[in-house]
Regions:
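Generic structural signal for hydrophobic residues
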Residues: 10-12, 195, 335
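Short hydrophobic "helix-edge" motifs at membrane interfaces and signal-peptide entry regions
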Residues: 10-12, 65-67, 314-316
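Intrinsic disorder/low-complexity segments, especially N-terminal tails and targeting/processing regions
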Residues: 19-22, 365
Length: 368
């Protein structure tokens, strides 16, 4: 599903996380499974993979059984082909019967400051998106990294002096999104509209599974964060994102195409290739500002919170629905792996359901 940041620009959401709700924390430490070797800035690989267009079915639904209750889970993927249309009939049928529709796991970092005071904090959040003391990226980054950044910025963004004053994680994410767009890919806009449409028609609301974390001193936290200088994790985030933009977009497109076509074999083979936004989130979670406020252990807390919501849905409703990233469904350490010991069966979209098979055999046997 698309990321929601309460109306505040996603471009500085990582820096202003303390003032922005509903930041998804899953896959926070994910990295591309095969690191891409740095290349000469002039040797940027053009896309070799054709991004699909038109109508496509998506990967299907995972089924989690507990007794006669079923939780259906749609695996999400970002980015996806920009010009595809998702054939969502199967999901719409399940949503029409679901007693509850769970939102994706995540964390909502907020405070009891009220809407008006929250609006007055937006300038502080925007300042937190910039480098301390007005520094520019050419002053902060190693020379070789800045050379790569500059070449890719010229290619995908053009002349934009303002971006040079933004923190590395934010600046490189804007570059990443521009590169995706130029290559027929996008983040969001495929799955969420379908869910919203069905929920609106049924008069239902999405049931959030986000962990609520309160910050007593958001303004002070933003002030502290603004003072924090460049850390090794910040440079690693930028460097790895440049690797993807320079050499890894064909693999990104292959995974996007696989989701669209429902090619589970390719999705399994490429499991672990995490969202670049989520990969860079880990650099924020390692800041002193985050550690002092207990935000550095969010991954385990968010997972436990989602598992509790899934347990409740399975206990209370014959049919329920949720979304998780494909990585969390396929990985051995993901949310689905943690849920497996708590339920009777977990079935992938390409796995037969024993109950359905028995029913089908009974019908065949009764047919003269």
């Amino acid at each position: 599903m698309g990321k929601r940041f309460g109306g505040v620009s996603l471009a500085f959401a990582m820096a202003s996380i303390l003032a922005v709700p509903n930041v998804h924390a899953q896959d926070a430490a994910a990295r591309l499974s095969t690191p891409v070797a740095p290349s000469d800035p002039s040797d940027v690989r053009d896309m070799e993979t054709v991004v699909v267009t038109g109508v496509h079915p998506g990967p299907g639904l995972w089924r989690v059984r507990r007794g006669d209750h079923t939780l259906y889970i749609l695996g999400t993927q970002s980015p996806l082909p920009k010009s595809m249309t998702w054939r969502s009939d199967e999901v719409r049928e399940v949503l029409a019967e679901a007693g509850v529709v769970l939102g994706p796991p995540g964390v909502r970092v907020g405070s009891d400051i009220g809407i008006f005071r929250g609006l007055t904090m937006l300038p502080a959040a925007m300042r937190a998106a910039r480098n301390p003391d007005g520094a520019t990226l050419d002053e902060l980054l190693p020379a070789d990294v800045y050379q790569r950044w500059s070449a890719l910025k010229q290619r995908y963004i053009g002349r934009d002096r303002g971006i040079e004053r933004k923190r590395p994680q934010i600046a490189v994410y804007e570059l990443y999104r521009a590169a995706l767009d130029a290559n027929g890919l996008r983040e969001g806009g495929v799955i969420t509209p379908v869910l919203d449409d069905v929920l609106k028609a049924r008069g239902m609301k999405l049931t959030p599974t986000t962990l609520e974390v309160k910050i007593d001193d958001p303004r002070a936290a933003l002030a502290e964060f603004r003072k924090e200088g460049l850390k090794p994790e910040d440079v690693s985030c930028l460097r790895e994102t440049l690797d993807v933009i320079e050499r890894g977009l064909p693999q990104v497109a292959t995974r996007a195409n696989a989701w669209a076509a429902g090619d589970l074999d390719v999705l399994r083979a490429t499991a672990g290739q995490g969202s670049q936004l989520q990969a860079c989130m880990s650099s924020f979670l390692q800041t002193d500002t985050a550690r002092k406020r207990g935000l550095d252990d969010l991954e385990a807390r968010v997972r436990a919170h989602w598992l509790a919501a899934a347990d409740q849905a399975l206990d209370a409703h014959p049919v329920s629905f949720a979304t998780l990233s494909v990585n969390d469904l396929l990985g051995t350490a993901g949310y689905l792996a943690a849920l497996r010991p708590r339920v009777d069966a977990v079935l992938a979209p390409d796995e037969a359901d024993a109950i359905e098979d028995v029913d089908a055999e009974g019908i065949d046997a009764a047919t003269p």
